């Protein structure tokens, strides 16, 4: 019998093949085109039907962010491309949210550094990039807005290399691929002078260069790194499964920072799919999930 969720819907089977998962964090200064890029990545993943309009500010849907134009509470979206699931993890763009930066980056296995072809790397992204390099994430550099007048993509690429070198990047991290393009005009390429007609070059490079998460066997374990909220089910715990496999309806132990432990039950298990979530039967090590039914949890 196929399990159902709390609404009675049948659950999807979630295969435990981490080779088909890529967890990637996006690091970008405000106005360097992060939201537009994610829009186009979602489109390339065929997540929008022809009759759907792509709304702006997919990631920036927090009221405070709309006012300030920065991303504070990290969001997760996911695309499927060439039989691979790419979990896109948004990062806070300011060091003011340092605690969240580290938690969010620990869900990723690589990062996209998005840089404006005219402005180059900005001081606000230095903190997040430094944290990403320190925990060993492999970077892909995307130099965006190369269609801007008077931009200088080659100089920006050199500035990014110098920044990473000064942040003590390893030799492997310094061997990063650089991708040029215009998210607004929906193209990415290995040469800024040679536009293409889509952004699949970027998606192919993510699959090729960013390592798949490792599947670690054992008792299931997850660090809650962020929360979502639904008026229907309340607080939702979000995190990357570190070890083992969680199943829908499973009894678990919630460990708090003070060392106390409480028995809980997973009422619904979800993975991210497009801009939303999909109820699943199980989630294995390496994937990012959202758990419903966990009461009194703490982030981190």
Regions found by a protein language model. Name each.
Residues 63-73, 77-78, 128, 134, ...:
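N-terminal, positively charged nucleic-acid-binding surface of large information/translation enzymes
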Residues 165-299:
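Conserved catalytic-core segments of large NTP-driven translation/proteostasis enzymes
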Residues 32, 98, 149-154, 192-198, ...:
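Ordered, soluble secondary-structure elements with a strong preference for glycine-centered loop motifs
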Residues 105, 111-173:
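Conserved C-terminal guanine-recognition region of P-loop GTPase G domains, centered on the G4
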Residues 2-115, 119-121, 159, 227-230:
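P-loop NTPase switch module centered on the Walker A-proximal segment
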Residues 32, 48, 94-95, 118-121, ...:
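Conserved nucleotide-binding/hydrolysis micro-motifs of P-loop NTPases
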């Amino acid at each position: 019998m196929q399990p159902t969720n709390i609404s009675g819907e049948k659950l999807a089977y979630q295969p435990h093949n981490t080779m088909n998962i890529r967890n990637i964090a996006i690091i970008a200064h405000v106005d360097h085109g992060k939201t537009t890029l994610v829009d186009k990545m979602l489109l390339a993943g065929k997540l929008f039907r022809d009759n759907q309009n792509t709304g702006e500010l997919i990631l920036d849907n927090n009221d405070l962010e709309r006012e300030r134009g920065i991303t504070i509470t990290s969001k997760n979206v996911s695309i499927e491309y060439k039989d691979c699931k790419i979990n896109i993890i948004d990062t806070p763009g300011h060091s003011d949210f340092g605690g969240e930066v580290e938690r969010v980056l620990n869900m990723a296995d690589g990062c996209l550094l998005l840089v404006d072809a005219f402005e180059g790397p900005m001081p606000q992204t230095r903190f997040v990039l430094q944290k990403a390099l320190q925990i060993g994430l492999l970077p892909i550099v995307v130099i965006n807005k190369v269609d801007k007048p008077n931009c200088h993509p080659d100089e920006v690429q050199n500035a990014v290399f110098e920044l990473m070198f000064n942040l003590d990047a390893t030799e492997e991290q310094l061997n990063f691929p650089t991708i040029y393009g215009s998210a607004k005009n929906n193209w990415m390429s290995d040469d800024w002078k040679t536009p293409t007609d889509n952004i699949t070059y970027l998606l192919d490079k993510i699959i090729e260069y960013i390592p798949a998460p490792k599947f670690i066997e054992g008792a299931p374990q997850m660090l809650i790194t962020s929360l979502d909220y639904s008026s229907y089910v309340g607080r939702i715990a979000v995190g990357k499964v570190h070890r083992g496999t969680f199943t829908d309806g499973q009894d678990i132990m919630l460990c708090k920072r003070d060392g106390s432990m409480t028995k809980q039950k997973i009422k619904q298990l979800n993975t991210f799919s497009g801009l939303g979530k999909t109820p699943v039967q199980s989630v294995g090590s390496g994937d990012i999930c959202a758990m419903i039914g966990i009461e009194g949890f703490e982030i981190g």
